[in-house]
Amino acid sequence: MAFHSLLLLCLAGLLFVSEAGPVAHGGEDSKCPLMVKVLDAVRGRPAVNVDVKVFKKTEKQTWELFASGKTNDNGEIHELTSDDKFGEGLYKVEFDTISYWKALGVSPFHEYADVVFTANDAGHRHYTIAAQLSPYSFSTTAIVSNPTE
């Protein structure tokens, strides 16, 4: 039985990763340099209505709220920021996992899942941050691409 559960989880992960690639938002003048995608690994479908906050580290080494949103029916958030505002720096994406699971009647272990990353240090890039959630674990991955790809 454990083998079947593990197999289903792996298949859900493959589906998630295959659909987590960058989405075209108008070609070279794309206004979507940061996109978030969230999958509910327990139910095997997009995680809808997950609150997400993006913070940027300041010169004073504190985190300042940079952007926020809520995942749509596809488990995605587009247009969190624009190319002009998304400069080089250290960013943190915070997924509010406790609110998501409690709304489904589940008591989770984690309150938040955070992804901290350096953006645009090697030139301007577009980022897709993907998270796969379950009540007691989470995994993340990122797809980094040139805006013209």
Swiss-Prot record:
One of its GO terms (cellular component) is extracellular space. L-thyroxine binds at K37, E76, S139. The modification 4-carboxyglutamate is found at E64. Keywords: Gamma-carboxyglutamic acid, Hormone, Secreted, Signal, Sulfation, Thyroid hormone, Transport. Coiled coil: none annotated. InterPro entries: Thyroxine_BS, Transthyretin/HIU_hydrolase, Transthyretin/HIU_hydrolase_d, Transthyretin/HIU_hydrolase_sf, Transthyretin_CS. Residues 1-20 form the signal peptide. It is found in: Secreted. Detected in plasma (at protein level). Detected in liver. Gene3D superfamilies: Transthyretin/hydroxyisourate hydrolase domain. GO terms for biological process: purine nucleobase metabolic process. Sulfonation of the reactive cysteine Cys-32 enhances the stability of the native conformation of TTR, avoiding misassembly of the protein leading to amyloid formation. Its main location: secreted. The modification Sulfocysteine is found at C32. The keyword Secreted applies. It comes from the Eukaryota. Pfam families: Transthyretin. One of its GO terms (molecular function) is hormone activity. Homotetramer. Dimer of dimers. In the homotetramer, subunits assemble around a central channel that can accommodate two ligand molecules. Interacts with RBP4. PANTHER family: TRANSTHYRETIN, URICASE AND TRANSTHYRETIN-RELATED. Thyroid hormone-binding protein. Probably transports thyroxine from the bloodstream to the brain. Belongs to the transthyretin family. This is Transthyretin. The lineage of its organism: Eukaryota, Metazoa, Chordata, Craniata, Vertebrata.
